[in-house]
């Protein structure tokens, strides 16, 4: 099948690799190179780099909402468009430009976690099951019909990186299965109940509320690493917790109290045992290294 691919980050790479192997990728659309590092050198997106290595034509428009881009897409000899974490809204004229429309990999059990941050919200909400869906896109926000779906259980303390990689690889495999059977698949309309929205994360959301349960705080730590990071303030400095574990233990302490010299913190229910931290503008340290340089005394009440 002849394919136009639209995507940008590492999450989209496994799918493009599969498409290059099994189909004919006619063109790739991705975000423009961005300045990175201290030298602010322009860096291609992971998708741009992969397409470049395979000598696939790459386009980096600043928007899809203009006639020039729509005409360009219409001229590309393709049967279908695949869109994965591209970063731009796809207008109706492009959604309907090819025979089989536009397909999208969405890493959640739709209609749960529609929106920009389904992986993060899955972990933050403490979900124990999830899915990867192949969806035919329409003009709504992740409201299109489901062509194929695979459910799976989540490990209790899965990290964002682990979930990201699992869904990216599973989605790539599911996409190839979908394309192989696309003429025989009966699309399934998403149910109207159970709709939730995985809104984009904000830095403010990362602030830890010690009145929440240790389990919920641990979910936030895993779901917000690396960005924005779950953090607390100490001596007017922001400190991110990169890794921790929760203990289902009863206690009589005020929420936020440091109850040991190993940085175990009393929460609304349970205790959070911190394992890895990062003070702003400093490198990440395990708890032993951190406490050698920053002494957070027992009985301190964190805010």
Curated annotation (Swiss-Prot):
Gene Ontology molecular-function annotations: methionyl-tRNA formyltransferase activity
* Catalytically driven reaction(s): L-methionyl-tRNA(fMet) + (6R)-10-formyltetrahydrofolate = N-formyl-L-methionyl-tRNA(fMet) + (6S)-5,6,7,8-tetrahydrofolate + H(+)
Name it. Methionyl-tRNA formyltransferase
Q: Which organism is it from?
A: Rickettsia africae (strain ESF-5)
Q: Name one GO cellular component term.
A: cytosol
- Check the record and name the NCBIfam families matching this protein: fmt
Family named by the database record = Belongs to the Fmt family.
Keywords of the record, alphabetical order, are:
Protein biosynthesis, Transferase
**EC?**
2.1.2.9
Q: What domain of life?
A: Bacteria
Cite the binding residues for (6S)-5,6,7,8-tetrahydrofolate.
108-111
The record's Pfam families line, in alphabetical order, gives:
Formyl_trans_C (PF02911), Formyl_trans_N (PF00551)
Q: Note the HAMAP family from the entry.
A: Formyl_trans (MF_00182)
- Role according to the record: Attaches a formyl group to the free amino group of methionyl-tRNA(fMet). The formyl group appears to play a dual role in the initiator identity of N-formylmethionyl-tRNA by promoting its recognition by IF2 and preventing the misappropriation of this tRNA by the elongation apparatus.
Q: List the InterPro entries.
A: Fmt (IPR005794), Formyl_trans_C (IPR005793), Formyl_transf_N (IPR002376), Formyl_transf_N_sf (IPR036477), Formyl_transferase-like_C_sf (IPR011034), Met-tRNA-FMT_C (IPR044135), Met-tRNA-FMT_N (IPR041711)
